[in-house]
Amino acid sequence: MSKRQTGMTLIELMIVVVVLGIIIAIGVPSYRGYIIRANRVDGTSALLRLAANQERFYMQNNIYASNAQLAAALPAGLGIAATDHGYYNLTIAAAGAGLAVGYTATATAVAGESQGSDADCWTYTINEMGLRTAATQGAADNTGVCWQ
């Protein structure tokens, strides 16, 4: 009479470990890319909100708000201290002829945060005309990809 052995062999266990390693090696970068693309909304939505608040500010004051008025509560400012999740820094620059004529608002990814590794959509901009642009970390235009 022979005894039947039950359980797993070392080879079977190693095969399972290798398969899990392959799944993790493929899955983690894909998930990371998904999170980066999803977090881009933090910058774009903040800029669109800022642009709407700029128009409201302009209607009341006949001049666009400056960078110093970014965080001040309405109606003295725009009421936007930062993006909702803090992945982007917001700044406002006057147009060539000054804030009475126009502005350019910029959202730049915060280094060290999750968006700090987003090389494809590092900065977003919008101006008083609604013109949207986006650039990579190397300052190459990537508007078509980033403002989808």
Where are these regions (language model features)?
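Residues at secondary-structure transition points
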Residues: 5, 37-41, 45, 98, ...
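Periplasmic/extracellular, small/polar-rich flexible segments of pilin-like filament-forming proteins
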Residues: 59-148
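N-terminal single-pass transmembrane signal-anchor helix
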Residues: 2-34
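Alpha-helix exit/C-cap motif
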Residues: 37-41, 49-69
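Conserved catalytic core of two-component sensor histidine kinases
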Residues: 17, 44, 51
